[in-house]
Amino acid sequence: MAAQMSKKRKFVADGIFKAELNEFLTRELAEDGYSGVEVRVTPTQTEIIILATRTQNVLGEKGRRIRELTAVVQKRFGFPEGSVELYAEKVATRGLCAIAQAESLRYKLLGGLAVRRACYGVLRFIMESGAKGCEVVVSGKLRGQRAKSMKFVDGLMIHSGDPVNYYVDTAVRHVLLRQGVLGIKVKIMLPWDPSGKIGPKKPLPDHVSIVEPKDEIVPTTPISEQKGAKPDQPQPPVMPQPVATA
């Protein structure tokens, strides 16, 4: 008999599972453009969709690597044999994924590229991909012994309110260089997309859409309208008049 679990414990257990799975995949697939994970639970099995920019590297030669990852996940989280399946899905718009861009910037800095040049390259690529705005912050020992932070901003960026939850994609990464650890923070403001493919379907609260007026048909000849006759209204009852007495 399966043990009963309260709703509160179920939500906590699901959150811990997804966080631990995300941390494991981030560590394993960092060089393959790992950009997130989706978990879909069906009655028969659990489907784990890995979002990455280089899906061929995630799959490996003849699917060997994805099978190894499936075996590790199955053993670590105690799934029954054949009840968990891993899939690799390519990120549709790499320039609008904050995790992919943070990893890209991380490898540029590891390769010895200057901070300013690397950040402006990422900024330009994000804006060319159709983002409404972006912000890149790099902090740490950038030049001297004193730690400082450099911020690079382009376009529009919102910082407060409910739309931040679904319009702004954020990612934080750390890179270990010779002089110390640098922190990387990338924020991308997604565009409004009614189809929901590259951005949220819901428009911003302050978005004003102007509807084009319909073309009026100007009559060329005089016309007359035949209106239907009004139905006879019932007459109000006549009140009896008081009779004057002598």
Swiss-Prot record:
UniProt-recorded name of the protein: Small ribosomal subunit protein uS3B
Organism: Xenopus laevis (African clawed frog)
GO CC field: cytosolic small ribosomal subunit; mitochondrial inner membrane; nucleolus; nucleus; spindle
Single GO molecular function: RNA binding
PROSITE patterns given in the database record: KH_TYPE_2, RIBOSOMAL_S3
Pfam family, one: KH_2
Protein family membership: Belongs to the universal ribosomal protein uS3 family.
Main subcellular location: cytoplasm
Domain of life according to the entry: Eukaryota
Protein purpose: Component of the small ribosomal subunit. The ribosome is a large ribonucleoprotein complex responsible for the synthesis of proteins in the cell. Has endonuclease activity and plays a role in repair of damaged DNA. Also involved in other processes including regulation of transcription, translation of its cognate mRNA, spindle formation and chromosome movement during mitosis, and apoptosis.
